């Protein structure tokens, strides 16, 4: 194989469509755009979701719910992620230092997902019932 013998695989480099270049090309006259109408004109596009003046589906459906502002500063921490923290006292700052949660997080909750093998002390974090049982079974404890 040499640089001067390289060529693209068969069919991988099709020639571009040359539109409006005569009837024999197959894309002459209207150039594959059909007859008249907005989509046949240059710049004739409709925005996403536009239904020709009819009230769009997005606006016909009711609004519901909201985004809790508290959820933006709250994180769920899995039991398996507690192993990433060095030391056996786990609090908000140690989770941030270990890059388990981001710096803008104010509240964290430990949930039962994965396993924990080492005995750790969890300070100042919310803990689910299942996670609490798993931490205590591993010889750890929870402090408020």
UniProtKB/Swiss-Prot annotation:
Coiled coil spans: none
Assembly description: Part of the 50S ribosomal subunit.
Compositional bias (Gly residues): 21-31
Presence of keyword Nucleotidyltransferase: no
UniProt KW Ribosomal protein keyword: yes
Native species: Aliivibrio salmonicida (strain LFI1238) (Vibrio salmonicida (strain LFI1238))
Gene Ontology, cellular component aspect: cytosolic large ribosomal subunit
Region (Disordered): 1-52
Record's keyword terms, sorted: Ribonucleoprotein, Ribosomal protein, RNA-binding, rRNA-binding
Function: Binds to the 23S rRNA.
Highest taxon of the lineage: Bacteria
GO terms of molecular function: rRNA binding; structural constituent of ribosome
Protein name (Swiss-Prot/TrEMBL): Large ribosomal subunit protein uL15
Pfam assignment, any one: Ribosomal_L27A
HAMAP family cross-referenced by the UniProt entry: Ribosomal_uL15 (MF_01341)
GO biological process, any: translation
Biased composition (Basic residues): 32-44
């Amino acid at each position: 194989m040499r640089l001067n013998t390289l060529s693209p695989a068969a069919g991988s480099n099709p020639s571009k469509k040359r539109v409006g270049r005569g009837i024999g090309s197959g894309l002459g006259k209207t150039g594959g755009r059909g007859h008249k109408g907005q989509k046949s004109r240059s710049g004739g596009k409709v925005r996403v979701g536009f239904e020709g003046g009819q009230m769009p589906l997005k606006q016909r459906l009711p609004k519901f719910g909201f985004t809790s502002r508290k959820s933006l500063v709250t994180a769920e921490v899995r039991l398996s992620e507690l192993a990433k923290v060095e030391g056996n006292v786990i609090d908000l700052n140690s989770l941030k230092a270990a890059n388990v949660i981001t710096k803008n997080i104010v509240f964290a909750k430990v949930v039962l997902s994965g396993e924990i093998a080492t005995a750790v002390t969890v300070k100042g974090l919310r803990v689910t019932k299942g996670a609490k049982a798993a931490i205590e079974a591993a010889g750890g404890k929870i402090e408020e």
